[in-house]
Amino acid sequence: MLFGKLLPREGNFFEMFNQHAERIVEAARAFAQLVANYNDVQLREQYNRDVDNAERAADKVTHEVNRLIHKTFITPIDRDQIHKLINTMDDVADLIQDSAETMALYDVRQMTEEITRLTDLSVKCCERVKEAVSLLGKLANPATAEAALKTCEEIDRLESDADRVMRSAMSKLFREEPDVREVIKLKAIYELLETITDKCEDVANVIEGIVLENS
């Protein structure tokens, strides 16, 4: 019992979740600007750096949460849920950075409509993740819990939209692009962008579990 008394009882987990979600949105929006300004090399490099900075900041929050889990005697929600949520969120930030790095590495000729649409859906998913995460500290209010669940449903719908865009993009790519190298590049980018929305759906699933168990 003495050991438990020496440890903090809760820790500021919800605030750190919010900080991480903000960094995810920053990374997603910076990536969207990278796509929108792809033909401007200087702007493209600047937004690539912005993505990197946001991802590194998110990574620091993840490490702090994982450290705090082991230092906190009583956590506000289950430790496994905390660990799963923050690490799944961090996967989203990593995928956004991977997408930006892949874009730079492959030097795609130009942005396609499908990249723009998938990017837009990714940004919307990340924004909904931030919205849902912001509600986790207020689950004692039934209306807040219901709002969190509805936001998770929105993320699911956005992920389904991304699936449809992805299938259409692949069909068009194999049908119309004569350059095999460009096919390989675009296929990899489409898959990464769609995976961002998949991972946001994974975050939504974790949040749904937290809401149902703690409201």
What would you call each of these model-derived segments?
Residues 1-215:
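Cytosolic, long alpha-helical scaffolding segments
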